[in-house]
């Protein structure tokens, strides 16, 4: 199996051709939905949708991030491929446990959504957030399967899921947003995530990546140990962010603008970084350190600097938002995300 790095003269290491192919597929999977977000923003503008309600997903999505991180990050180590392939029984056992845990948390969140929204100064978005909770549960299925495909170097399946998602999202948004406004965006997400999840599971079975089995005690013990550590860390980070930033943003009635700014940062600027981190996690046996990844980070940062003068026009045009206002939110955050770039690839 090829690993994330190979030795060169002098001990310096680099990504392999196979890794670059996977990296490209992951970037497409992450970036093309951002391209579609440009279309969604136009749909939102045409249908006079309340962007401040849709912007509440900014903090609500942190719940999903905590669960996904706690459940999947340990699996990059526990589901190590044998002879280039992961064990189908382990994959299935991990999936069954993960979806059960996620479902329980989803029910709890839905039962407490009124109190959560009130705490975050988002009482006007209770219905939207309630539906989004179901959407995130459906979306987790696809997210889990993409992890399985990534571990098995199946970039073709990742690309197929991407194309399917984009086509379905176009149709779903036009149907649901035009009929149900802001809540329609949540309905569209449920529909698309459910279909993509079904396609992903069937594809995984068809490829032999899943075979029914229940998890063993030793496997669960190791999973819980790593997951608890990772989950607590990301929970503390996100809780502080939600309370200190998102709650304050809601208090001054700016969730819509902050949501757009965050979409620009995470949907465009940080995509190469997050995808690089995914490739690194997959190839955990040889850790990528600053000695051999600095070149990739510098290239990413160089692209930022080159394109920075055009950011405001991009936000004003394709993103159909107030570029002057959004750029004032984005620029002060850049130093923090430079730090994130470094930490993401060496954690």
PLM feature segments, named:
Residues 22-30, 62, 132, 158, ...:
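Residue-level signature of transmembrane alpha-helical cores of multipass secondary-active transporters
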Residues 103-130, 302-324:
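Short membrane-interface helical motifs at transmembrane helix boundaries
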Residues 53-103, 142-146, 150-153, 255-304, ...:
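Small-residue-rich hydrophobic transmembrane alpha-helices
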Residues 39-44, 239-248, 264, 280, ...:
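Hydrophobic/aromatic end-of-helix segments at the C-terminal termini of transmembrane alpha-helices
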Residues 161-173, 179-208:
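Hydrophobic alpha-helical transmembrane segments
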Residues 2-24, 123-124, 186-189, 198-238:
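Interhelical loop/hinge segments that connect adjacent transmembrane helices in multipass membrane
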Residues 43-66, 124-126, 222-226, 245-267, ...:
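Interfacial/gating helices of multi-pass transporter permease domains
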Residues 120-145, 160, 260-268, 318-347:
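Alpha-helical transmembrane segments of multi-pass membrane proteins
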């Amino acid at each position: 199996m090829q690993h994330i790095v190979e030795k060169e003269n002098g001990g310096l290491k680099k990504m392999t051709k196979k890794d670059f192919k996977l990296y490209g597929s992951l970037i497409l999977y992450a970036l093309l939905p951002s391209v579609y977000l440009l279309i969604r923003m136009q749909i939102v503008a045409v249908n006079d949708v309340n962007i401040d309600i849709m912007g509440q997903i900014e903090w609500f999505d942190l719940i999903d991030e905590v669960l996904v991180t706690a459940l999947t990050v340990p699996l990059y180590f526990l589901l190590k491929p044998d002879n280039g392939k992961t064990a189908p029984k382990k994959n299935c056992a991990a999936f069954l446990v993960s979806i059960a845990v996620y479902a329980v948390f989803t029910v709890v969140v839905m039962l407490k959504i009124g109190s959560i929204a009130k705490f975050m100064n988002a009482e006007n978005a209770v219905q939207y957030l309630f539906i989004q909770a179901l959407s995130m549960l459906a979306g987790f299925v696809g997210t889990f399967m993409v992890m399985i495909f990534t571990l098995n170097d199946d970039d073709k399946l990742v690309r197929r899921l991407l194309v399917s998602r984009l086509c379905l999202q176009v149709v779903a948004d036009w149907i649901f947003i035009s009929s149900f406004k802001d809540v329609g965006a949540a309905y569209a997400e449920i529909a698309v995530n459910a279909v993509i999840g079904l396609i992903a599971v069937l594809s995984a079975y068809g490829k032999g990546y899943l075979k029914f089995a229940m998890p063993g005690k030793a496997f669960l013990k190791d999973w819980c140990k790593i997951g608890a550590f990772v989950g607590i860390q990301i929970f503390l980070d996100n809780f502080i962010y939600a309370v200190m930033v998102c709650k304050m943003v809601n208090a001054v009635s700016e969730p819509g603008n902050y949501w757009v700014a965050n979409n620009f940062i995470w949907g465009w600027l940080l995509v190469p970084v997050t995808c690089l981190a995914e490739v690194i996690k997959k190839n955990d046996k040889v850790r990528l350190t600053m000695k051999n990844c600095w070149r990739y980070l510098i290239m990413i940062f160089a692209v930022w600097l080159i394109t920075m003068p055009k950011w405001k026009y991009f936000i004003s045009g394709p993103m159909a938002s107030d570029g002057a206002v959004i750029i004032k939110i984005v620029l002060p955050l850049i130093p923090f995300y430079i730090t994130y770039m470094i930490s993401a690839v060496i954690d």
